[in-house]
Amino acid sequence: MKNRVLWCLLLLPATLMAQPARYPLTSIAGLRPINVVIETASLEGKKGLKVEASPESLASGAGGAEQLVLLEGLEFGDGVIEAEISGDIRPGAPEGARGFVGIAFRVQGDLRTYDAFYLRPTNGRADDQVRRNHSAQYISHPDWPWFRLRQEFPSKYESYVDLVPGTWTKVKIEVQGEQARLYVHGVKQPTLVVNDVKSGASARGAIALWIDKDTIAHFRNLTVTRRQ
């Protein structure tokens, strides 16, 4: 009996994680664009999904709606999200554009409420150290945009990571309750640790590719492993 109980305990961690759901992003099937234009395209010889803000979104100005690509039919609360992403500045973008690109999770039905990690690729090798320190960011819309987090909690939700615009970058997001961690470039230590995810410990929602309207983004090889 003792051996049986021990065996069940050993198996328990494995049963907590569902089988990974894989999205190569080499087609637009199963994707719902929100205020963006999507198409398959190659970057650095690798095929993926190209994402840009729609003309209507660009015309709406700085206070416009979110730019997302929703993964249809997938609900996520806790688990691991992995992908290769790339961000660069679109032609004609204003001077302050940084090529924001990332992944949103626990996206609610209003498409405005979510948590996200994103990168600012043009900050990664800037000559200004302050800009470098703002290379990776956590946000929680609509109540906690980056500028509010930076104003009220300087440096807590941002960090440095080496980035090059227009280049594939591996990212991994681990979410467990109110804790989330961002890993970049496949390293073992997280780039950014958040211990008070604003959506709360039990929130669930969709996953979406996330961009700023002044970004030309590419995504590929998205994998989602949900914790059951």
Protein language model features and the residues they cover:
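Bacterial N-terminal signal peptides that target proteins for export
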Residues: 1-7
